[in-house]
Structure formats: C-alpha cells, structure tokens
Amino acid sequence: MKIDPIRNRLYTLTVLSCYLVLTPNMLSKLAFNALHGMKEYISELIQFKKLNSLNSENNEWGEITNDSKYEINILFIGEMMRSDYLNVYGYNEKNTPFLSSVNGTFVHNFYSADTHTVPSLRIMLTYQGENSKIEPNYPKSFINAANNAGYDTYWISNQGLIGEYDTPISFIAKSATHKYFIKLHDNNAEDHDMLKVINYYISKPSKKKKLIVVHLFDSHGYGSLCDQNKKFMTENKLLKYSETNKKDVECYSSAVTKTDKIISETYKTLNSKNIKFSIVYFSDHGSSESTDNAGNIFYKHEDNDKAGYKIPLIRITSDDT
C-alpha cells in the first residue's frame, strides 16, 4: 500500500503532531498499535480485492423454501452494545422501557464473533458450515439466502462510509434489492433519522415477504452524540451526568434508551398494520469498561475482556402476547 504524504496532508500532519507532543514511551506504544492496525488493514485490503472480483450476487445457496409466516421481518444490527447495560438484561437503570415491558425472547450468554465491527459481522452474517476454520463465506451471506428464498430485501445503514461498497459489510449489503445509506446523504444523521426510511420500506407495496436490515450507529457514538442523547436521560441520569467520572456511563446508557425507542416506534408501526411480523435485535460486539488516570469511566474495544463479546439477542413477534 502506497501513501503519498503530499496528497494525504491529514495523515502527514497527524504523524508530525504525534512526534512533537508525545513522549518516547507513548510513541513506542503508538508505533506498535499503528503497525498492528496497518497489518490488519492491509489484510482487509487483500481480502476486499478478492471480494471485488466477485459479483455481489454470486450466490451459492441454491433453492431455499420460504415457509415463514411473517410478512415483514426487521433485523436491527446494533453497534458496541453490551447486554449487561440493558435494563431488560438486569442493568440497574431503567433504560429499556419498551423492551422491559414487551413479551419476547431475550437470549442470555450470547457472544459476538469479535470485538470489532467488520471482523465480527463478516462471520455472523455469513454461513460458516462445518469448516473448522472460522472465516467469512460471502457468497453464502444471509442476504443472499433471503433473496433465494424469495424475500424482498432492504438494507438501511447509519454507518459512516466513504462509499457505499468499501467494506466487507457494505459488500454484503450490496446484495440487498433496496439500499439506503443515511450518512451518504447526511453526515450528521442520528439513528432516529432512519425511522422515516424504515416506515417507507414497511409501507412500500410488494408481493413478496420482506426482510429489512437496519444497521444502527447505536452506542458506538455515545460520546460524540451525548448532548443529543440528553433527551433520553431521566433526572437521575442528568444528575449523574454532571459528575465527571459518570458522564460516559450516562451517555452510554442513554444510547441504549434511544435504541429502545427506535425499536418501540418500529413495533408500533408494524402493529398498526395488522400483519404478521418479526423484529430481531443483536449487537455486532460489546465493549470493555475502563478508567483513565483521572478516574473517569469510558468504553473501548478490548479483545481480552469477555464484556467485549457479550451482546444482546432479542426477538419480538406479532405472536408474542
């Protein structure tokens, strides 16, 4: 991979700034992390080059019988949401008012394939079969399976992208019949902005059953979106939010409440249609709670922490009463 320092001014300025302000010890850690990240990135580029040599509709599933009774199926894919921070899974803050009140299936002790989005979802969204080596099988993605089963497939995403098809996950999304990437249209989009697109696809006339995938930004942006998320905080949460070391905790918890609200609004829309439906939610990975030198709690990716893998898996259907 070739980086042109003249064209990549931001990259050059970042490197120079690091050398000016960081200590030797910090630089050594930064260099190690940078090399590790570069190695992973190059590996992804090699794999993605192989992906681009394939047609996204290259489908190895064969004929699949569609005997599901549900006319509309919604799959919410969350981001960085660990299950023990949801009230419905036992968290002490009442941050899931809808999920805690509705009947459904709530799976405990469910774990993601990785602690980062792409490595996790490329495994979780493709068929592994009997292979002892766990690796993505893109021609056998779940979207291709739904297409073969005769579903009308939709993919709505609030994940920030350079282009629609520049990651393995967006490559899977490309196989959907209908695609809408919110952040290609609005860089400041919130997950709530997807509700109008979800409602449009729910109401869109179709002779087929529907699979609608909604890829949320979820709690991944808990810090940058915290001011927006204040409207989801109770008075008790706002009080804790004023405590410096509790700020990120309440931001993270309010992101959970926002997702709960989105699922609730979608449920209400589907329920008003008097149709058979299914809603599934899971997160791509969890997060690890950590503390900085000042005692402030924050969340990060951590391969060696079980919490980085522990995620919610929820299913709610029109049959649940």
Range-by-range predicted roles:
Residues 56-60, 196-200, 236-279:
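A long, amphipathic alpha-helix that forms part
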Residues 86, 267, 291:
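Active-site-flanking alpha-helical
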Residues 133-138, 246-259, 301-309, 321:
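A short beta-strand-to-alpha-helix junction
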Residues 90-94, 271, 275-319:
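Histidine-centered active-site microenvironments of extracellular/periplasmic hydrolases
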Residues 147, 318-321:
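Non-catalytic, well-ordered alpha-helical segments in soluble enzyme domains
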Residues 1-34:
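Transmembrane and membrane-interface helices of multi-pass
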Residues 25-239, 308-310:
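Active-site-proximal alpha/beta segments of enzymes that process anionic O-linked groups
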Residues 155-157, 211-218, 253-256, 278-283, ...:
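Short beta-strand segments
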